[in-house]
Amino acid sequence: MPKEALLYKVIDSSKRLVECTACPRRCKLLDGQYGFCGIRWNFDGKLYLVSHGLAIAVAIDPIEKKPLYHFSPGSLVFSMSTTGCSWACKFCQNWDISQRRVVAGWRLEPELAVKLAMAYGAHGMTYTYNEPIIFLEYAYDVGVEARKHGLFNTMVTNGYMTEEAIDVVVKFMDAATVDLKGHGDKEFARKFSLVYDTEPIFNALVELKRKGVFIEITDLVVPKYGDDLDKARKLARWIVENLGPETPVHFLRFHPDYQVMDLPSTPIKTLEKHIDVAINEGLRHVYIGNVPGHKFENTYCPNCGRVVIRRMGFDILNVDLTEDLRCPSCRYKINIAGRVYPTYKLERFVYIPLEAFTEFVHIKPDSLRDFVLYGKRSG
């Protein structure tokens, strides 16, 4: 349940003024105020993560859905989220979760989350659907418990995090999908996500990589506003120079949603041009996402071109690798962290009936203070 945050500092104790240090917005909050994300509240001069222990969405997914193609392929992950987000993307497909500003969710303490993950056959945890940095203290507690039982931790993040947040992330996170939009261009982010600057994302990428978190990158290619090939080239070059040519990069097809219904889906030819640009800049593992059946869902050996993992959507159809994860033709070592899980042959979407294990909690705004400080609940 609600817990005092790790990521904040007191600015003025006499005024009960605090600064949240989870994301680069660094919201400064007086008593009774909450941050942009909607779930980090100041009560009596302390910052609380009010959604700690409240998961709004939970499911067992294939890890490829994140997408993570090069980390523990074939595994099952226990996906979980809270409400809220540090961004306000106008095209968000999970807007009902990310833009919801209420304190609500299934009561899911870390021990129960891990217990359910293991009971339903998950190999790891994924913090996803909304931005995990805003509920990092909750994810951390779940992640530490998960590691006690041999489960790995991954997250899908916009990458918009502070140095203080990175220091927490690297204590328990094994892999991250960093979800760029429009090539990480700051003007695009200002227009569509209410984010002033994207530089913190690139700083975070370098630090996460340096500190041992396995990184894959997605880039949402949006027609008209976020499909410039010169910017794609600049991004690919930056990745090669700062993260390495073996970094997996996924160019995702945009579909109209939420407040952006007037744009078409990204033409497949546009995505293919992005692939060409990325390969020409030296990236060795590039993919097209949200186009099931496309040849660039597969993993190819960068040396000889052999298909070493064949995919259809989120499913793996065939794995053609040696035991030590090399191409069987030329012995090139494929950049895969962990191992390939034989569960790729199984159905990996699993519904979890949370109502059988716990209760749904919805706290009314006028009773939130008593709920956080005293555990009293009237809503």
Task: Provide a role label for each language-model segment.
Residues 1-75:
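Flexible, acidic/Gly-rich N-terminal and inter-domain linker regions that tether
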Residues 1-31, 225-379:
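Auxiliary Fe-S-binding modules of radical SAM enzymes
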Residues 73, 106, 197, 267, ...:
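Short, conserved glycine- and acidic-residue-centered signature motifs
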Residues 110-269, 277:
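Conserved AdoMet/S-adenosylmethionine-binding subsite of the radical SAM
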